Amino acid sequence: MDWDLNAAGAWDLAELERDHAAAAPSSGGHAANAAAAGTGTESRPPAPGAAGAPAECSVDLKLGGMGECEPGAARREREAAAGAAKRPRPAGPGGQQQQQQCPSCAVDGCRADLGKCRDYHRRHKVCEAHSKTPVVVVAGREMRFCQQCSRFHLLAEFDADKRSCRKRLDGHNRRRRKPQPDTMASASFIASQQGTRFSPFAHPRLEASWPPGVMKTEESPYHITHQIPLGSSSSSRQQHFVALGAATPAYAKEGRRFPFLQEGEISFATGVVLEPPAAAPACQPLLRTGAPSESSGAGGSKMFSDQGLARVLDSDCALSLLSAPANSSGIDVSRMVRPTEHVPMAQQPVVPGLQFGSASWFPRPQASTGGSFVPSCPAAVEGEQQLNAVLGPNDSEVSMNYGGMFHVGGGSGGGEGSSDGGTSSSMPFSWQ
């Protein structure tokens, strides 16, 4: 199908020219159309079939008329009518906008300008003066401003001289105060102290396996308890305490008396046996005895018997325990010193026979003129451990009962006190 482009273009241009020429003489009709458009009504051109009506333009988009055909006076009138329809809202003195910018104080009769106050006071509608006043009138009731709640409360909800209400203060204190721990009683705290360390118990506990009168303390890791039943003349058994470890010569220098001895007391300065007190104390503390030796440097230990004690043994030997090797020690009593003359007493035996359990460890020597015997022991070699001698009051046999065991080995010298065949022997003792 062929199109005649020239004929079609000529027809369109001719139609437009005819419409423009017909619209020019009818300017009054266009003014009426412009006034109708200003009032909101749409002007429609007359139908093309009507007599004397111009034909509608085909390029019109029907947006209110053709702009180029509208005169200037009609446009101004339309703009003035549209501006008169938009009237601004009048803002009175008590308008909402003004109230949001400058709120007034909630206290009755207050005319303070909150515009000059801080944002806190403007937000809560209270002036700075009334926020700290003890009593204010709000809505006819006496109230007070709470600085924690930032609200007005009745006076009954406040404590005396408090700026916050009682309810808010209770929650504030619970959040910020920690619970206080229970205070310890000073008396029980001091009573539980033992030495340089503290014990959770006010008094040492007694165990069922301990003998009567024996007490265990933290200061006594080497607390040894043994019983020495004497012969027929002995009336009771005495518990003796031996403390090993670092020797402390303070007792010997100061000459202290130890009241734990039930049948007699000994002063370490003079070595004199004192009379026993009327009532022996129930608690027998730990005793650290022995002065360092001048020759060997080992800490000495002492054992005390009950009746007729007239001599104090000053021996520079140490008690051999489980830690000592079995083949490096022997039993030896190097010397016995008379407390008054301080002379060696090895020539005067005082113990007729020393028995441990039922076996005799030392043969009984011949009795001397004094009627006393001493156990025969070999001379100590270098590195040997020595045992303290135990003094007896009479010629009867003295036996020592122990609860544990410790070994005494035969030295290289092989004296009478060593066991047969060079094997180690066991000596029972109590280790608490």
Curated annotation (Swiss-Prot):
The job of this chain, per UniProt, is described as: SBP transcriptional regulator probably involved in the domestication of maize. Acts as a transcriptional repressor binding to a 5'-GTAC-3' motif. May repress the growth of lateral branches in length and numbers.
Q: What is this protein called?
A: Teosinte glume architecture 1
Q: Which PANTHER family match?
A: SQUAMOSA PROMOTER-BINDING-LIKE PROTEIN 16, SQUAMOSA PROMOTER-BINDING-LIKE PROTEIN 4
Which additional comment does the entry carry? A single Lys to Asn substitution at position 6 is the probable cause of the transition from the hardened fruitcase surrounding the kernels in teosinte to the cob that bears naked grains in maize. This substitution is not affecting the DNA binding site specificity, but increases the stability of the homodimers.
Summed up, the tissue specificity of this protein is: Strongly expressed in immature ears and weakly in husks. Found in the inflorescence meristem of the developing ear, in the spikelet pair primordia, the glume primordia, the cupule forming region and other floral organs. Not detected in other tissues.
Domains: what does the record tell us? The N-terminal domain is necessary for dimerization.
Report residues binding Zn(2+) 1. C105, C110, C127, H130
Per its UniProt record, what InterPro entries does this chain match? SBP-like (IPR044817), SBP_dom (IPR004333), SBP_sf (IPR036893)
Q: Describe the subunit structure.
A: Monomer and homodimer.
Keyword annotations of the record: Metal-binding, Zinc, Zinc-finger
Q: What segment(s) does the record annotate as region Disordered?
A: 20-55, 68-102, 409-432
Q: Name one GO cellular component term.
A: nucleus
Which Pfam families does this one have? SBP
Name its species. Answer: Zea mays
